[in-house]
Amino acid sequence: MNETLPANFHNNEDVKYGQLRLVDIPAELRDHVPWFNQTLTIVNDAVVRLGIFEGDFPWHKHVDQDEFFFVLEGEIELDVENREAVRLRVHEGFTVPKNVMHRPRSPKRSAVLMVESLGIVPTGDGPMA
């Protein structure tokens, strides 16, 4: 399969909102287009990211870290190896365990919060399928 990242993928791992700062999700949603991934804040040893999805992301995995997806706007499907795809609608979440191949897909623009270990590689650190 040897998939590549979407041509318009942009990842900003710089923390935008430090502690004791209001995180303005509506402003972030206005300011970004798909496929944008913004690190919002750090909580202990985890990062909270906002992703704007539209279309298919490549299959990938995070060898040593779990990844939590929570839909704020729109709807996504998570293809996960060795199980049926999981459809997530607004205010639904799902955790993909470490070392499991997965890919998010969204037929239309969707906004997703992700909670991941600090230092995770958002595009995956395992081989793409």
What are these regions (language model features)?
Residues 98-126:
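Ligand-binding loop in jelly-roll beta-barrel domains
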Residues 47, 56, 68, 75-77, ...:
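Structural motif
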Residues 52-53, 62-81, 115:
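Short, conserved beta-strand element in jelly-roll/cupin
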Residues 50, 85-87, 101-103:
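Well-ordered beta-strand positions in beta-sheet-rich domains
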Residues 82-98:
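Short acidic-glycine-tyrosine-enriched beta hairpin
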Residues 33-34, 47-63:
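Conserved short histidine dyad/triad with adjacent acidic residue
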Residues 1-49, 128-129:
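A short, N-terminal "cap"/entry segment at the start of jelly-roll beta-barrel domains
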Residues 44, 72-73, 89-90, 108, ...:
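A cytosolic small-molecule/anion-sensing beta-strand core signal
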